[in-house]
Design a protein with these regions (language model features):
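Short hydrophobic/aromatic-rich motifs at helix boundaries and adjacent loops
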Residues: 38-43, 82-83, 126, 156-159, ...
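C-terminal cap of thioredoxin/glutaredoxin-like
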Residues: 1-13, 17, 52, 145-218
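Loop/turn elements at helix/coil->beta-strand transitions in domains of secreted/extracellular proteins
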Residues: 45-46, 76-80, 105-109, 163-166, ...
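Extracytoplasmic thiol/disulfide redox context detector
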Residues: 1-92
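Periplasmic c-type cytochrome electron-transfer domains
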Residues: 7-30, 110-114, 123-127, 145-152
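Structural alpha/beta surface segment adjacent to cysteine/selenocysteine redox centers
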Residues: 53, 59-146
Length: 218
């Protein structure tokens, strides 16, 4: 009888060891709500972040906190992390569509690239002339984001990160992707009552007055 119990317990013990030693940061997926998730899907803590790629405070959080969160909490299976875009402006729409269009495996690397290089890639958009603005506004609405992205130099930014121009154009022409970003923003405001970025939801509960690692960390 004792031997039978030992054999029955062995698979569970093996699973526990595998879970403890697995690097969960390598496990990524898309969510039905439009986010991208990293980590153990059965983690006891579900951390959802809404952020904008053009938001300086979001950049600060990702540089200051995400390495610690990944190493200490996500990699060890304690936290499942999901990122959802909360788009704030045209350049944010363009960058978000480009970061998202190749799926979750590529997304997190591009997310990091957009945050780390935020000042560099957003600067050209601050220098658009009145003539640039009029030219963009004269285009059909479904062509404006793509034209804005090219005007701001995002084609070059993505080319140096392995995205050919044909794929760049394809990503920015994806109407469903644009609509999904719009839905996520609406969901953030209506469901979670968010008013700014970054914003955090833990196990379904919005964290009030929490905008940085100092106020979020356990």
């Amino acid at each position: 009888a004792t031997g039978t119990k030992t054999k029955a317990a062995a698979p569970a013990a093996t699973t526990a060891i595998a879970t403890a030693t697995k690097d969960w940061t390598t496990v990524v997926s898309a969510t039905p709500e439009g986010g991208f998730r990293m980590g153990n899907p059965n983690a006891p803590v579900k951390l959802l972040e809404f952020a904008s790629l053009t938001c300086p405070h979001c950049k600060d959080f990702h540089e200051e906190a995400l390495p610690t969160i990944k190493a200490k909490y996500i990699a060890t299976g304690k936290v499942n992390y999901e990122f959802r875009n909360f788009v704030l402006n045209g350049p944010d729409f363009a960058a978000s569509m480009l970061a998202r269009c190749q799926g979750p495996t590529v997304f997190f690397n591009l997310l990091n690239a957009f945050f780390v290089n935020q000042a560099m890639w957003t600067e050209p958009f601050t220098k658009l002339t009145e003539a640039d603005t009029k030219r963009l506004q004269a285009l059909p609405e479904d062509q404006q984001i793509a034209a804005l992205a090219v005007t701001g130099g995002l084609d070059g930014f993505m080319r140096t990160r392995g995205m050919p121009r044909a794929k760049f154009d394809q990503c920015l022409a994806d109407k469903k992707a644009f609509e999904q970003l719009t839905r996520m923003r609406t969901d953030a405001v209506e469901k979670y009552k968010l008013t700014g970025t970054p914003a955090f939801i833990i196990n379904g509960e919005t964290q009030a007055e929490t905008f940085n690692w100092a106020t979020l960390q356990p």
